[in-house]
């Protein structure tokens, strides 16, 4: 397993929480339009937006990058497998690696997990003590 894949590894409970948050995003959007948005809705919306912004997808131009992020989001929102999404501009394995990275960023921005940068700082701090 490569270092990039290990970097975005989430435990099963965290994966379920993040997928449920993204899966319920359509309901959150309806509440927002109706003016009944909760604080958690705002936090979840911001976390999803930040995750989309954090996705690097090296080798893609901006249009292809936005398309790929849209497909990743659609896959999680509607629980659709790669095979049902149509044109994704990448192979199945790479798509699921990107999807895992997206879930990691959502969890990180919601505060469910500690970010990689913060985690490495904590390790460095412990090493110096």
Predicted regions and their residues:
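Generic recognition of cysteine residues
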Residues: 58, 90-91, 103
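Helix-turn-helix DNA-binding module
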Residues: 78-91
């Amino acid at each position: 397993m490569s270092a990039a894949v290990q970097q975005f590894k989430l435990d099963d409970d965290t994966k379920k929480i993040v997928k449920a948050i993204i899966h319920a995003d359509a309901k959150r959007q309806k509440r927002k339009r109706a003016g009944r948005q909760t604080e958690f809705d705002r936090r979840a919306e911001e976390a999803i937006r930040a995750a989309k912004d954090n996705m690097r997808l090296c080798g893609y131009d901006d249009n292809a990058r936005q398309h790929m992020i849209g497909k990743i989001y659609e896959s999680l929102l509607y629980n659709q497998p790669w095979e049902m999404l149509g044109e994704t501009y990448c192979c199945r394995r790479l798509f699921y690696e990107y999807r895992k990275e997206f879930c990691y960023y959502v969890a990180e921005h919601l505060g469910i997990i500690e970010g990689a940068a913060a985690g490495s700082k904590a390790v460095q701090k412990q090493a110096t003590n």
